[in-house]
Amino acid sequence: MTDKHRILLPLLLIVLLVGCGKTDDGLTIEGHDWTYANAIDSAGQPLDLSVLTCAAQDGTLTLTDSDGSTQSGTYTLTQRDANDVLYDLTLDSETGTALVGVTEYTDAAGGQSSEYTLILSLPEQTVYFRADMAQ
């Protein structure tokens, strides 16, 4: 084996093994208990929505309010990178986007915490949800 091959072969193996060892990072709309955080209208003004939960499974998104009323829609994966995942969204005949990412916080004492964030952007409103990282 030449010196060139002695260097290239281990580098190639490292690259391949790094890809094989990747685990699920949780950046997906599915598999989380999404709870309502806040909402704004298209002008950026806060909306007073009842408490909502959001569930996503197999391309179907369901929003449920505190009275048990539901809205359903569909989503499809559009783009994924290391920091977030973007979906096309249709909810009760409105089209928009859904974005899943991680929000990091630093408190006054310097302590840090993180949570998953789901942002539903529709023409008339944007709704923010959160989910624990431990899920």
In which residue ranges do the predicted regions lie?
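Tryptophan-anchored aromatic micro-motifs
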Residues: D25-P46, Y75
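Short, solvent-exposed coil/turn segments at beta-strand boundaries
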Residues: L52-L61, T103-T117
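Bacterial N-terminal signal peptides that target proteins for export
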Residues: M1-L8
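An anionic, turn-rich surface loop/hairpin at beta-sheet edges
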Residues: A82-A109
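C-terminal motif of bacterial Sec signal peptides marking the signal peptidase cleavage site
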Residues: L16-G19
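Edge beta-strand at a domain terminus
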Residues: T70-D81, T117-Q135
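Bacterial signal peptide processing site
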Residues: G21-T23
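N-terminal glycine/threonine-rich, aromatic-flanked beta-hairpin/loop signature
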Residues: Q45-L86
